[in-house]
Swiss-Prot record:
Subcellular location: Cell inner membrane
Key words, A-Z: Cell inner membrane, Cell membrane, Membrane, Transmembrane, Transmembrane helix, Transport
TM regions (residue ranges): 7-27, 45-65, 67-87, 90-110, 118-138, 162-182, 212-232, 240-260, 261-281, 288-308
Family: Belongs to the binding-protein-dependent transport system permease family. AraH/RbsC subfamily.
GO terms for cellular component: plasma membrane
Topology relative to the membrane: Multi-pass membrane protein
Main location: membrane
Name of the molecule in the record: Autoinducer 2 import system permease protein LsrD
Organism of provenance: Yersinia pseudotuberculosis serotype O:3 (strain YPIII)
CDD domains per the UniProt record, alphabetical: TM_PBP1_transp_AraH_like
Biological role stated in the UniProt entry: Part of the ABC transporter complex LsrABCD involved in autoinducer 2 (AI-2) import. Probably responsible for the translocation of the substrate across the membrane.
Amino acid sequence: MNLYRRYGWELTLAALLVLEILLFGLSNSRMLDINVLLFSTSDFICIGIVALPLTMVIVSGGIDISFGSTIGLCAIFLGIVFQAGVPMSVAIPLTVLVGALCGLINAGLILYTGVNPLVITLGTLYLFGGSALLLSGLSGATGYEGIGGFPAAFTDFANQTLFGLPIPLVIFMLCVLLFWLLMHRTHSGRHVFLIGQSSRVARYSALPIARTLCMLYAMTGVASAIAAILLVSYFGSARSDLGASFLMPAITAVVLGGANIYGGSGSILGTALAVLLVGYLQQGLQMIGTPNQISSALSGALLILVVVGRSISLHRHLIYEWLQRRRSRKASA
């Protein structure tokens, strides 16, 4: 009982995930093939790598919608640095530093101006996206081709396995463990929850708000850089549009995973399960031949249904009291 009370939403998501796979398996038996399930994660798991630190940002009461542009900027930066003759062993750490710098720019602007994080990161979304396009143009990269010619050892990395699992999935699982420990087993994680519940109380309690926010946005930038590196390795080319479609799926996964969009509550494990739920929904719909427009609409409908259902569950006592009052008024009338 205590387990369900503590992880009730996560268990619900896990049950929905199993049910989803079984239902799609009735239409296409390939959906029940364990190898298909494992290796199809490479198509969407990078969204999850970014969604994990984004969960902590949202729990703190903030938001970052610039990570898609950060991915594109880091990807094209990696390609340009490689083109310049820098070894991959140096280019990859430099790319991670660029991602961290993007996150710190977001945090610095939010702390310095006091403007809503949504507005700040909307601005940096265009700043980083425009910078990626500018670098892409200067490097001579064209359209969908991007910058290629990477070493085989690098392009094979994201397509290899470790203990029978795809490398991107292994990295995602390690990130889940890392962020779960950080959020639920450290003082920094408790600070994130307290800041999200009331930034004013957190300020009066002398919590390190500035340091915590810098850490959160920097981690989102680093995760974006890691996602960019994996995507470049997976596709074999560096393009400025690699993260363009990540925004809505990542935010959907965070909200679906149980995070309060206004801050104060959230779950790393819930986000991880929601990433798989949304990812396999898209994969399953593609396998049964559903057009992309319909699959996107169904994903949005799923989010709305789950959010409404969760809201009803959280406020069921208030709803019950309201119904009781209505019955009492009708009886007295």
